Amino acid sequence: MLFVAACGNGGGSLFNDSIDDYISNNYSLYDTISSTENSDEYARVYLAEDRDISAVSSELQDHEEPTEMSELREGKQVFIYDNQFVTLTESEDNSSDTMIEVAEEEFVRNNYSPGFFQGYLLASVLGNMFGNNWGSQRNQACAANPERCYGGYNSAGTYVGKNSIPTIRGASTVRGGGTGSGK
């Protein structure tokens, strides 16, 4: 397992946006993923066009050091900020783009497959956050109901929380149209 502990200030000054605000202000919202457990929980997926994972990783770390951070491996890197998980993956549509998934801790606890983090974060980090039995309990839940176990945005599978009609993507790329056009 590869693991790097980030040493930093754990958050910026009073004048810095939270990492969630920084991401939403600097990248395009691409899609949302609904929780299978609680309709108030969801993950947001952003698109960093023409920026590879290393560039986006540097931008995020320059804004705020994560409390935990994996190494970049096989087109994926995971950060933990306070109560949020940020996952960077290479876009399946364009290898020069990066997908940025932001999920609250509770969304991760209740929806993610433990295997999603295998090789990226130590089990002890997740155990400290979610309880020592989280991995085995989620594995059992995933075995019983695989469609209720989320494997990340670019994963194949039948997770029921994935929006069959994406909330953002699929919209026209043509902007404008004047008053009353609905854009």
Report residues per predicted region.
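Low-complexity, glycine/proline/serine-enriched intrinsically disordered segments
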Residues: 8-183
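C-terminal motif of bacterial Sec signal peptides marking the signal peptidase cleavage site
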Residues: 3-6
